[in-house]
């Protein structure tokens, strides 16, 4: 299995599949926001940023999968998936155990050199409350679904990193 994951990490297909899944999730979030009129909270926006990190890592990996640049993509992938797990866990706890003392920020805080909320307000401005339950599917809220998704991204990322020393076996039918 590790040899297979190593081989997949050196091809564009797996990276493009990851980019497709992350892009599909981002488009779904925008659909929830602009079509279903659900208000994203601050943690939702941060989770969206973590998902953009996974998307960016996938695109970097797809650009040059056989070069050392794929290791940069793996680091970004690991970091983004880990931060996504942290953020969605915090968000899930806020929704499952609401408290007037445990709240999220009132507005998104981006660095001054990257004010995404001012550049693309349709995507990065938060207007909802983190503790409010707006949507559920099969008995789970949106942060709980995202927690499972980010855990899956993280597990696969760890396995791909572990698989890097395991090179694919050369198949030689004639024993040359």
UniProtKB/Swiss-Prot annotation:
Sequence intervals crossing the membrane: 15-31, 50-65, 72-89, 145-163
Principal place of residence: membrane
GO biological process: protein folding
InterPro entries the record matches: DiS_bond_form_DsbB/BdbC, Disulphide_bond_form_DsbB, DsbB, DsbB-like_sf
Disulfide bonds: 41-44, 104-130
Protein's membrane topology: Multi-pass membrane protein
Function: Required for disulfide bond formation in some periplasmic proteins such as PhoA or OmpA. Acts by oxidizing the DsbA protein.
The protein's name in its UniProt record: Disulfide bond formation protein B
Originating species: Shigella flexneri
